């Protein structure tokens, strides 16, 4: 086990983005229609501007999607963008019920950047990519204060620690 403690002002949390290999049996038009039923959608930047915005890369273009149904900000887990994406898009639209076991979803750590998401979609290795606003240290602490754990693949911490055997010569 590797454990470390950092002051909250010395750790950076980057987004843990997602790519999905296929559209769950939907064609492109039906996929976009299903998105528009649940989200406001407009052309937008590759990096979300604020919490609540999810950037989606599909067919060579970036879109900003925002849920039509508001999130309960008093729910520290349910209000996270990763939870909103899972509950309102990945599960109902793309039929990805469990991101831990579904082979159609991959995760791209924030350090790899937006260009990696575009490369994966443009090369055909993924059908769609989602760029998320990073979880804040405050969000992380709020979840911890409830005794809960963060959703899988919701945080990418920097600096990364090298793990392995450490030897100190005396």
Set out the residue ranges of the language-model regions.
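Surface-exposed, charge/polar-rich loops and edge strands
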Residues: 1-170
């Amino acid at each position: 086990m590797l454990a470390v403690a950092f002051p909250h002002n010395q750790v950076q949390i980057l987004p843990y983005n997602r790519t999905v290999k296929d559209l769950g049996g939907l064609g492109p038009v039906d996929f976009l229609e299903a998105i528009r039923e649940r989200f406001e959608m407009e052309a937008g930047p590759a990096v979300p501007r604020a919490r609540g915005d999810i950037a989606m890369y599909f067919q060579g273009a970036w879109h900003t999607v925002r849920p039509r149904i508001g999130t309960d900000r008093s729910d520290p887990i349910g209000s996270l963008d990763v939870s909103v994406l899972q509950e309102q898009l990945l599960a109902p639209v793309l039929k990805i019920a469990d991101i831990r076991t579904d082979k159609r979803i991959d995760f791209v750590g924030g350090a790899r950047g937006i260009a990696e998401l575009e490369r994966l979609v443009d090369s055909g290795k993924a059908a769609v990519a989602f760029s998320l606003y990073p979880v804040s240290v405050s969000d992380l602490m709020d979840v911890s204060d409830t005794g809960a754990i963060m959703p899988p693949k919701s945080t990418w911490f920097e600096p990364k620690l090298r793990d392995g055997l450490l030897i100190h010569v005396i």
